[in-house]
Amino acid sequence: MTASAKPVSSVDSFFSATLAEADPEIAAAIRGELGRQRHEIELIASENIVSRAVLEAQGSVMTNKYAEGYPGARYYGGCEWVDVAENLAIDRAKKLFGANFANVQPNSGSQMNQAVFLALLQPGDTFMGLDLAAGGHLTHGSPVNMSGKWFKAAHYTVRRDDHLIDMDAVAKQAEEVKPKLIIAGGSAYSRPWDFKRFREIADSVGAYLLVDMAHFAGLVAGGVHASPVPYAHITTTTTHKSLRGPRGGLMLWNDEQFTKKFNSAIFPGLQGGPLMHVIAAKAVAFAEALRPEFKAYAKNVVENAKALAESLRAQGFDIVSGGTDNHLMLVDLRPKGLKGNVSEKALVRAAITCNKNGIPFDPEKPFVTSGLRLGTPAATTRGFGVAEFQQVGSLIAEVLNAIAQGPDGSAPLVEAAVKEKVKALTDRFPIYQ
C-alpha cells in the first residue's frame, strides 16, 4: 500500500456496497421476483407494476427521515425537503381527484379505514358495509377484523339472481339499523356503485358515507369510472392497485369540518412518523396519473377486462353478474366442477397468476372457494391489449378445462405447454429492461 492509499473502512463499505455484495440472499430473492414478474401474466386484481421513477423515489434517501406531524408543523428539525415532497403529494392528489383536502400519510388501506372509524365512531357503534362474501373487504366489518370486533357491523349484500346490490334493500336496512356510517366499495364487485343513492340513504338516517375506492381509484382518476368524491363525506383509497403507485393509503374529503378529525386520526391517532420515501413515491405516481396517457391506460384496463370476461364466457365459463364494468371479474367455477384453490395452483404452474376468491353465497370455505378473481391492471401496464387478453382467456380455459378432466387437479402436459405460450407472450411485452 502506498503512502497515499486509503484503506477501505467499514464506513466506506456501508455507503458503497451493492445489495448483491451486502446481502446476496436477499439480492437473489429480488432477482427471482423480477424474473417471476417478467415471465408470468399477473392477473391479481389488486396488483400492478409501478414505473421506474416510482421505484427510484421509494428507494431514495427519504427513507432516512423522521417527520412526525404535518408539513410546516413537524416534531423534528430538518424537514424542509420532506415537506416539499408531502406538499406535492397532497396538491397532486387533490387535483387528481377534485378534492378540497387530502391526507397522504396512511401506510396502508387498512390503516386509512381504521382512521375513519377512529375519527367518526365510538366502539360499539353500528355501521353498514358490503358483506365480504358478496365482494366487500375485511376492513368493512369482517368478524376477524378490528372493524368487526370493535364495532357492530350490519352487512348488506347482493341479490341472488343477478349478484347486483339492491339499493332499495340497502335503504330499508339502513332505516332499520340506523347506522352511524355506511361504507360503499369493495374488493370483488365488478359493477358500478350508485354513490348518489348511497349518499341519499346516508343522509336519510343521519349517517356518514365512506367510499372505499381502493380497487377502482385509478379508473376514477382516468375518467372511466364515476367519482365518489362529490358524494362521500370521506373517500379512501390505496395508492397501488389500479392507481399504479407505491403500496400505501390516501384519504380525501371536501368539508373542512373534518380536517382536524381525519388528520388527528392518522397522526397521532394511529401512526407516528410517516414513511416519507413512500410519500415521495406517491407524489410521483399522482403526477403520472395526471398525464393524458393515464386516461388512455384506464380506458384500456376496462376494455381489456371486458374482453377477458367475454373470452371466458365464450368458452363456457360463468362470470358473476354476467360481466364487468371495471378492472376485475369473478369466475364461478362450479359449473366446471372446480374449486378456486385447485384452479389457482394450476394456473400458477402455467405462469398465470391469480387468486382464489369466494363468490356470492359461496358454500366453500375461504381457503377453498368456488371462484377465481381476475384483474387487468398489471398486464395492461405492460402493454397487453384486447387481442392479448382474448388469448389469455383461451389460455386460462385450456388449463382449467384440462384439470377438470383430470383426477388430481393437475394437467402437467397442458400446464407446461401453456407456460411456454405465456413466455412467448410476455417476451413481447418486457418490463424493467
UniProtKB/Swiss-Prot annotation:
The modification N6-(pyridoxal phosphate)lysine is found at K241. It catalyses: (6R)-5,10-methylene-5,6,7,8-tetrahydrofolate + glycine + H2O = (6S)-5,6,7,8-tetrahydrofolate + L-serine. It holds the Pfam family SHMT. The keyword Nucleus does not apply. It is found in: Cytoplasm. It comes from the Bacteria. GO terms for molecular function: glycine hydroxymethyltransferase activity; pyridoxal phosphate binding. Pathway: One-carbon metabolism; tetrahydrofolate interconversion; Amino-acid biosynthesis; glycine biosynthesis; glycine from L-serine: step 1/1. Keywords: Amino-acid biosynthesis, Cytoplasm, One-carbon metabolism, Pyridoxal phosphate, Transferase. (6S)-5,6,7,8-tetrahydrofolate binds at L132, G136, H137, L138. The record marks H240 as: Plays an important role in substrate specificity. It is an enzyme of class 2 (transferase). GO terms for cellular component: cytosol. Belongs to the SHMT family. Catalyzes the reversible interconversion of serine and glycine with tetrahydrofolate (THF) serving as the one-carbon carrier. This reaction serves as the major source of one-carbon groups required for the biosynthesis of purines, thymidylate, methionine, and other important biomolecules. Also exhibits THF-independent aldolase activity toward beta-hydroxyamino acids, producing glycine and aldehydes, via a retro-aldol mechanism. Homodimer. This is Serine hydroxymethyltransferase. The lineage of its organism: Bacteria, Pseudomonadati, Pseudomonadota, Alphaproteobacteria, Hyphomicrobiales.
